[in-house]
Amino acid sequence: MSLEELEAMDQSNPGEFLERVREKIRMLNSETRILQSRVNTIKHDISTKNASIAENMERIRLNKQLPYLVGNVVEVLDEHSGVVNASTRMSSYLPITGLIPNSELRPGDLVALHKDTNIVFEKLPPDYDMKVGGMVLKSDAKPDETYEDIGGLERQIEELNEAIVLSLTHPERFEKLNIKPPKGVLMYGPPGTGKTLMARACASKTNATFLKLAGPQLVQMYIGDGARLVRDAFALAKERKPTIIFIDEIDAIGAKRSDSDQTGDREVQRTMLELLNQLDGFSSSEEVKIIAATNRVDILDPALLRSGRLDRKIEFPLPNTLGRKRILQIHARKMSVRDDVNFDELARSTEGFNGAQCKAVCVEAGMAALRKEKTEISQNDFMDGIQEVLSRKKSKLLYFT
């Protein structure tokens, strides 16, 4: 009944109006009691469900304290069901996979399974070898070397930038020209010419994950271990891309294959074959780049050097006079050096020195000044350092039995 009708009734018949109001109040009170009863029922249901949830959470907590079975996801069938393979080598179909949504599971994922029901409790980290995980440099442990710390290698820096840095930071430039960037780079040259330093400077130039391998580390005692390390390293690189894989002293596993029947030689060849397989297993646009370094390029297997694997070869020769001057200035810039030191003369006096020996000259010059209790390093101290390094270079060790 509307407000106008009530007002009209109030004026015509006051008694009927009051009765209608009382009836309306009784109806509202009845509806209020019904709604209050429903509210109480809902509160009771919520309390019961909360108690059930708390009980189930406690059961899950207790179950999580039990040992898990480690298994793999074989197939995700739909949004609820899937097939898992437990470590007991038993495959199980799960109508409901468990606590992890199927949208987060992929075939091959490592998962923790309940030992009785095989339902999935947790998604585990990928199963990489601990040695491979330790080769990844953390963000706070990345190399701090820069190209300014390298002297006499301007052409090599440009070539490495084109092949590695540019393809990771500006891949659209290659797409515009419809060309594929190189997969990897081989740096070769005499020892001490800056190959490892160049790789470290390249890693600091990009925000890519830096995975450092060493050839001797990949030579393992047991059959298949070296190949597994290579396989795990590339799998980890693809997961954490963009990634730079630096393989130092690649000649330890990349030497030319022979007909040797020795077990050790066959294991090294098996490791190299796995490396070749991994180099062929990804495209140059997958944001995984390889930098390899060696001072024995003459013994490397031709299969490793062919195009499509290590596409670009960069030679690191001994520095010339200008390069040696630049290297000496770089290593002496933070030292207390007198203003009259002639680096041109020092560079001419270090004919045949590599970059590491030029650094050693600066160290020996500092030691010579330290012995004389000087506060600054002079030209004569540098000449003494050159003589010291030169004597080590020409010395011969005689062994007597």
UniProtKB/Swiss-Prot annotation:
Family per similarity comment: Belongs to the AAA ATPase family.
Primary location: cytoplasm
Location(s) in or outside the cell: Cytoplasm; Nucleus
Positions that bind ATP: G189, P190, P191, G192, T193, G194, K195, T196
Function: Acts as a regulatory subunit of the 26S proteasome which degrades poly-ubiquitinated proteins in the cytoplasm and in the nucleus. It is essential for the regulated turnover of proteins and for the removal of misfolded proteins. The proteasome is a multicatalytic proteinase complex that is characterized by its ability to cleave peptides with Arg, Phe, Tyr, Leu, and Glu adjacent to the leaving group at neutral or slightly basic pH.
Organism: Encephalitozoon cuniculi (strain GB-M1)
Keywords linked to the UniProt accession: ATP-binding, Cytoplasm, Nucleotide-binding, Nucleus, Proteasome
SMART domains documented for this protein: AAA (SM00382)
GO MF: ATP binding; ATP hydrolysis activity
Protein's name in the database: 26S proteasome regulatory subunit 6A
GO cellular component, one term: proteasome regulatory particle, base subcomplex
PROSITE patterns (UniProt xref): AAA
Subunit annotation: The 26S proteasome consists of a 20S proteasome core and two 19S regulatory subunits. The 20S proteasome core is composed of 28 subunits that are arranged in four stacked rings, resulting in a barrel-shaped structure. The two end rings are each formed by seven alpha subunits, and the two central rings are each formed by seven beta subunits. The catalytic chamber with the active sites is on the inside of the barrel.
